[in-house]
């Protein structure tokens, strides 16, 4: 007898579960829930509208169940026994019987309607996103928007900081290259100045080396024969050989009229020697003065040239460029602080 009752309860449960999974039940219930779930939210307070909708739902469930139970011959007691049986307590059975239980329990009904409302919203958002490729601003969460804006600002800040650092590094590299270029240009200038001084010194030496020869030739061409006739040979022979040395003529070959110098008197030779010595000293002084003037001229000419090169290679920054550079550095420092603080 108990086995027959269990079999009967099992049959009733399976029969009801089959009906609840069928279109005769699922289509009208689903249509009602989708149409009425729009007003439901997850607030704790229950509105009057919720109660009215729940009453409508309860009437719909009773109508559908009564029609089915009459059709298969199940009375109300059998139905209640099947719903309270252990077979109806399983997880699968509870999921199937939830729409029926919601008709009797408002809490279950409200939770079901809120869940359906959320599912409908998510489905609508998914359809819009699939059609347009992006969601409108009105459907995005405020916190997500702020997060995206902050993320975009961080990207911009990092990019500005990177560009500022690159510009600063380029400026430093340009200054370093200018310093190296100036060092290279100054070194050849110094060498060229020294070479020019040496060349001028050699030129001065050659220039002043000629006058003694000219003096020698001029002195050699002078007619000294009349003087030789007035001087006695005995006096000439007794003159020391060292007194015959004339500046600029020590290494000159004695030939032609110059050989007649031996007949000159001692006093005359000394006068000649003194005269030539004065000339030599004067020429040496002139040579020294000219060399000094040339060095001074080269220094004076080299100084403006260096200044021009320095001005050309080192153009001073304008006030606007200085202000721009200062702003960049301040912005870089501010961005670094903000990035570090964040």
Curated annotation (Swiss-Prot):
Subcellular location: Nucleus; Cytoplasm; Cell projection, Cilium, Flagellum
Stretches of the chain forming a coiled coil according to its record: 150-187
Any Gene Ontology CC annotation: ciliary transition zone
Nucleus keyword on record: yes
Expression sites by tissue: Expressed in several human tissues including brain, testis, heart, lung, pancreas and spleen (at protein level).
Pfam family, one: ARL2_Bind_BART
Biased composition (Basic and acidic residues): 179-189, 282-292, 300-322
Ranges where the record places region Disordered: 166-194, 229-250, 282-322
Residues recorded with modification Phosphoserine: 85, 147, 201
Main location as per UniProt: nucleus
Keyword annotations: Cell projection, Cilium, Coiled coil, Cytoplasm, Flagellum, Nucleus, Phosphoprotein
Subunit structure: Interacts with ARL3.
Biological role: May act as an effector for ARL3.
Similarity annotation: Belongs to the CFAP36 family.
Protein name in UniProt: Cilia- and flagella-associated protein 36
Annotated organism of origin: Homo sapiens
Gene coding for it: CFAP36
């Amino acid at each position: 007898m108990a086995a027959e009752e269990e079999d009967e309860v099992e049959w009733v449960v399976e029969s009801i579960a089959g009906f609840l999974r069928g279109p005769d039940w699922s289509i009208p219930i689903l249509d009602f829930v989708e149409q009425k779930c729009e007003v439901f939210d997850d607030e704790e307070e229950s509105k009057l509208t919720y109660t009215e909708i729940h009453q409508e739902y309860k009437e719909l469930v009773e109508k559908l169940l009564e029609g089915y139970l009459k059709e298969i011959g199940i009375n109300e007691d059998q139905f209640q026994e099947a719903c309270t049986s252990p077979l109806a307590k399983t997880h699968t059975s509870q999921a199937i019987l939830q729409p029926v239980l919601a008709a009797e329990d408002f809490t279950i009904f409200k939770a079901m309607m809120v869940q359906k409302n959320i599912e409908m919203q998510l489905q609508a958002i998914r359809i819009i996103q699939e059609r347009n490729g992006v969601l409108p601003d009105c459907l995005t969460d405020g916190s997500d928007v702020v997060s995206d804006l902050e993320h975009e600002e961080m990207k911009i800040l990092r990019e500005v900081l990177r560009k500022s650092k690159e510009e600063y590094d380029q400026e430093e590299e340009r200054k370093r290259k200018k310093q190296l270029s100036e060092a290279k240009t100054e070194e050849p200038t110094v060498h060229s100045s020294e070479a020019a001084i040496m060349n001028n010194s050699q030129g001065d030496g050659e220039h002043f080396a000629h006058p003694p020869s000219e003096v020698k030739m001029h002195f050699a061409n002078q007619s000294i024969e009349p003087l030789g006739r007035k001087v006695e040979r005995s006096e000439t022979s007794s003159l020391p050989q060292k007194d015959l040395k004339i500046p600029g003529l020590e290494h000159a070959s004695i030939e032609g009229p110059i050989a007649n110098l031996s007949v000159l008197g001692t006093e005359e030779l000394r006068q000649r020697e003194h005269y030539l010595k004065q000339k030599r000293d004067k020429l040496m002084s002139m040579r020294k003065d000219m060399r000094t003037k040339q060095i001074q001229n080269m220094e004076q000419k080299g100084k403006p040239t260096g200044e021009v090169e320095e001005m050309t290679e080192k153009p001073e920054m304008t006030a606007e460029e200085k202000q721009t550079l200062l702003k960049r550095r301040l912005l870089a420092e501010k961005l670094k602080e903000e990035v570090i603080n964040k």
